[in-house]
Every structure is written in C-alpha cells, then in structure tokens.
C-alpha cells in the first residue's frame, strides 16, 4: 500500500434517504492508492447503496465526496468514470456474444478511417494487440482474445470483468476500482485467481473497494475493513488488528460500534 497523505476517494457525512427510510447515516469512508478496503455488512446494511453513491448511480441526500482531495459531485455514472472510478458489477456487465478483446475495449474502441477518410471502422486487430499488452502488464492469463465471453468459465469471465475495469483506471496508477461481490458463485481455484488479481492491482497503485460476504477473502486480500450495520459504519479497522469473530459481531450487531 502506498502512503499518500491524500485519500484517493473520501466520503464525509454521507446520508441517503428514501422517504422516511435512512439507508445511509453519516457515513465516513476513505481509501488510498494501493489500498484494498473491504466493505462488509449483512443484507440491507447499506453496502450496495454506498457503492451506488460512489459510482454516481445514486446521489446522496447530503454529504461530501472528494477524489484525490478535490470536491466532486456525481450526477451520473459518467461523472464518476470521468473522475477515474470504475465499477465492476456483480453481474459483470459483459457482452457474451463478443470476444474478450471487444469486451475489454468497450467504450474505448480503436477506429480506423474508412474509404476517403469517411466514417470509421473498428480495428479489431489493433484492439487485440492492445488487450494482450494490457493483460500482460496486469499479469493476467486468460483464453485467446478471439474467444467469445460466453465460452469462458465463471472465473475467466470474472477476470475479464476485473481486467476491463483495471485497464480503464490503471493508466496513471491513480484509479479507483469498486468491486461488488467479485467471487460470488466461484469455486476455490477461481476465487484464488481473482484474489491474486486484486492484490496485483493494489500493488500497481489502484485503490480498491471490495464489497463481499466472504470473510476469508476479505481477511486475505484487504488491508483494512469497514463494517456497515443498518446504514451506519460500526467498524473501520486494519485487517491485522481484527479477526473473524470481531467482524461477525459487528456485522450481526452483537458487538458494539467502534464509534458509539
């Protein structure tokens, strides 16, 4: 983990109300470059809502968001993307009928000019070369760039989704990656592959926020863990200073909040 004095992403006093329901209550969260922050909590604790605030899908009722120290307002996911934040969704959001290179290039296609300079065509060969280079830099091994995503295993699909987010944020080593249950429904070997990729991204300077119910994964891959319970942050602790029993206590409410 790097030691930057300014967080890559910082949320202060975030409230999110749905009518009389307070989904988020004065949430303070920060993550630094090269750090993996685990975000834990039971169903309905507010994890997904908080991710949606970070990704620009939801606008908070009140509170402040800062990216690399600069105050930011996200009115849409495009705003957060422009700020250097990428979201890897639980459903992966891959195009099954397209090949790996095309999925890695979505939104940043390489075009070559058409006849007489009119219009333009996707340069698939150039995209495959770029995708191969990017995966090599990430230390990722996967199937051939021409293989359709629908023919990949669950673990391979997850790696493609993670790599797509990583290649979009990793150019200046200042990106922020939001991961929503990246190992859901994966087997042990596939989970290990994803876990290794997350650590490599952090080692390359990417700030990662990982939402998961998988406590062993969180303990293995995260530098720090924050726990939400009923919309409030009840714990924020380095992994080295906690254990499964403490985390389960905060998640279930059996253990009092660190901030009470």
Could you say what each language-model-derived stretch is?
Residues 2-260:
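Glycine-rich phosphate-binding loops of nucleotide-dependent enzymes
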